[in-house]
């Protein structure tokens, strides 16, 4: 079994943990590869371009926070990912630093559970070529630096859903419901729910609210504006600047992200501890 390791190279503690992991793997004669940037930061030779790691590795290890896990998931495709939290929030990363070796041992023994997470798949035609992007959390279209408020036109299965003026629109999976969508007023959705949520960003109408839809729906969005360029972001990474009238199609991806589960974690407890969900405020505490 070969491990593909992706590290948040901007965190000293993540790099230190990666160095410790190398020693642990070598002592057990286990094969591993780092992505090129991580390998350079750690000064190790066992490396591969991250785009090729999926063909060489059986299991991925993400050392960082939720952002590192999201980044890793774009290249792991359907391979299992062990998420180790070396960040601040750690909402998606299943294991703490102290639990890392135990999690790897379970994978080696085959005694682990997988949490399948739905992805979004976005398509857009660019110069007669169809571009494809995926997102574990969300696909977001924003007004960017456009000085006026554009109109976002939305269709579901070729039927008009709405057209409203706003600063942007978020299409999120159940996994991504606790990310940008939540900050924009969207609902918390349990991860295994087969739904998406469409959340407006600062809409210009009080009647516009987030809407939860079945994840078998096909969503089409375009920006109605006389000019301008509008950022298309997938999991926080800008993929393209959309022109007015360019249609972005979003649907459920056939490829699931497979996260190695920490069976000691409970989603309700995570909401309380990570998001302080429903906690009573007690002055002085």
Curated annotation (Swiss-Prot):
<feature type="binding site">
    <location>
        <position position="167"/>
    </location>
    <ligand>
        <name>NAD(+)</name>
    </ligand>
</feature>
<comment type="function">
    <text>Involved in the regulation of the intracellular balance of NAD and NADP, and is a key enzyme in the biosynthesis of NADP. Catalyzes specifically the phosphorylation on 2'-hydroxyl of the adenosine moiety of NAD to yield NADP.</text>
</comment>
<keyword id="KW-0808">Transferase</keyword>
<keyword id="KW-0547">Nucleotide-binding</keyword>
<dbReference type="GO" id="GO:0019674">
    <property type="term" value="P:NAD metabolic process"/>
</dbReference>
<dbReference type="Pfam" id="PF01513">
    <property type="entry name" value="NAD_kinase"/>
</dbReference>
<keyword id="KW-0418">Kinase</keyword>
<dbReference type="InterPro" id="IPR002504">
    <property type="entry name" value="NADK"/>
</dbReference>
<comment type="similarity">
    <text>Belongs to the NAD kinase family.</text>
</comment>
<feature type="active site" description="Proton acceptor">
    <location>
        <position position="66"/>
    </location>
</feature>
<feature type="binding site">
    <location>
        <begin position="137"/>
        <end position="138"/>
    </location>
    <ligand>
        <name>NAD(+)</name>
    </ligand>
</feature>
<dbReference type="InterPro" id="IPR017438">
    <property type="entry name" value="ATP-NAD_kinase_N"/>
</dbReference>
<dbReference type="Pfam" id="PF20143">
    <property type="entry name" value="NAD_kinase_C"/>
</dbReference>
<feature type="binding site">
    <location>
        <begin position="178"/>
        <end position="183"/>
    </location>
    <ligand>
        <name>NAD(+)</name>
    </ligand>
</feature>
<protein>
    <recommendedName>
        <fullName>NAD kinase</fullName>
        <ecNumber>2.7.1.23</ecNumber>
    </recommendedName>
</protein>
<dbReference type="InterPro" id="IPR016064">
    <property type="entry name" value="NAD/diacylglycerol_kinase_sf"/>
</dbReference>
<dbReference type="GO" id="GO:0005524">
    <property type="term" value="F:ATP binding"/>
</dbReference>
<dbReference type="GO" id="GO:0046872">
    <property type="term" value="F:metal ion binding"/>
</dbReference>
<keyword id="KW-0067">ATP-binding</keyword>
<dbReference type="GO" id="GO:0051287">
    <property type="term" value="F:NAD binding"/>
</dbReference>
<dbReference type="GO" id="GO:0005737">
    <property type="term" value="C:cytoplasm"/>
</dbReference>
<keyword id="KW-0520">NAD</keyword>
<keyword id="KW-0521">NADP</keyword>
<dbReference type="GO" id="GO:0003951">
    <property type="term" value="F:NAD+ kinase activity"/>
</dbReference>
<feature type="binding site">
    <location>
        <begin position="66"/>
        <end position="67"/>
    </location>
    <ligand>
        <name>NAD(+)</name>
    </ligand>
</feature>
<dbReference type="GO" id="GO:0006741">
    <property type="term" value="P:NADP biosynthetic process"/>
</dbReference>
<feature type="binding site">
    <location>
        <position position="148"/>
    </location>
    <ligand>
        <name>NAD(+)</name>
    </ligand>
</feature>
<dbReference type="InterPro" id="IPR017437">
    <property type="entry name" value="ATP-NAD_kinase_PpnK-typ_C"/>
</dbReference>
<keyword id="KW-0963">Cytoplasm</keyword>
<feature type="binding site">
    <location>
        <position position="165"/>
    </location>
    <ligand>
        <name>NAD(+)</name>
    </ligand>
</feature>
